[in-house]
Design a protein with these regions (language model features):
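Catalytic center-proximal scaffold of phosphoryl-transfer enzymes
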Residues: 1-245
Length: 245
């Protein structure tokens, strides 16, 4: 890895630059052991590009090190990690799959209430509108009004987890239904989650990264290989082209 890492710099930087001008980008992060320390592998990706990097930070410092100007042309699809919402972006879309899982937990926590079930129904209705291609401005307005009313209900009579969840949703309420107005924006962040899962599998097979440099080198070559695959090319041939420079 170390021997060929420098040869990958140009291609790696080109991927990053193309993401800076992309209209839609998904992002996620996952823990990574480097030496004896906890670091974080970050992924920024879309249908054509994958950019992975590692950092000691799980916050804004890590993002700014690679995207100091943010992603001003992009709708950013993520979970609710606050660092993403401090970025300079065109718009946001919160991963609805995450929210559905959170709400299902509330259903199990208190089966006798119906607040979380109504939340799930609204989210699932929005997804069905997209799938059926049955979106109108009026339907979006009605959906947003129903969500606003639901989030305005008092939950103090329920377990504290309900109020905690509602407060979290209120912070991102403007980014629940972006995907209904922009057909290129997905309503989940599954692609980013799959991307970081591949890195987790690598660690389970081969163990931790021994050094910062090794983790960085892997991120470069992994980004190039994944981007090649997304564009219909061979991962092997992409890495071979880097090595043979």
């Amino acid at each position: 890895l170390k021997e060929n890492s420098g040869k990958a710099d140009c291609a790696y930087e080109e991927i990053r630059k193309r993401l800076e001008t992309a209209s839609v980008v998904g992002a996620d992060e996952t823990g990574a052991t480097v030496g004896k320390h906890l670091h974080w592998n970050w992924i920024f990706q879309n249908d054509l590009l994958t950019y992975v990097f590692q950092s000691e930070s799980r916050g804004q410092k890590a993002i700014d090190s690679k995207f100091p100007k943010g992603l001003p042309y992009s709708t950013l699809v993520t979970d609710r990690h606050q660092s993403y919402f401090r970025m300079n972006v065109k718009d946001h879309q919160v991963c609805l799959a995450h929210l559905l899982r959170n709400a299902e937990y509330l259903n199990e926590l208190d089966p006798n209430q119906n607040w979380s079930r109504r939340f799930i129904q609204l989210i699932e209705h929005s997804i069905n509108l997209r799938r059926e291609g049955n979106i109108t401005s009026r339907k979006i307005k009605v959906l947003k009004t129903k969500m606003k009313n639901l989030l305005g209900e008092s939950l103090t009579h329920l377990d504290n987890e309900f109020e905690k969840f509602k407060r979290g949703i209120l912070k991102v309420k403007d980014y629940l239904f972006t995907f209904l107005s922009n057909p290129s924006v997905p309503y989940d962040n599954n692609a980013s989650e799959r991307g970081v899962r591949k890195i987790k599998i690598k660690q389970k097979v081969s163990g931790c990264f021994r050094t910062d440099g090794g983790a960085d080198d892997f991120a470069k070559l992994h980004s190039i290989a994944e981007t090649a695959m997304k564009n219909g090319n061979s991962k092997f041939n992409a890495i071979l082209a880097v090595v043979q420079q």
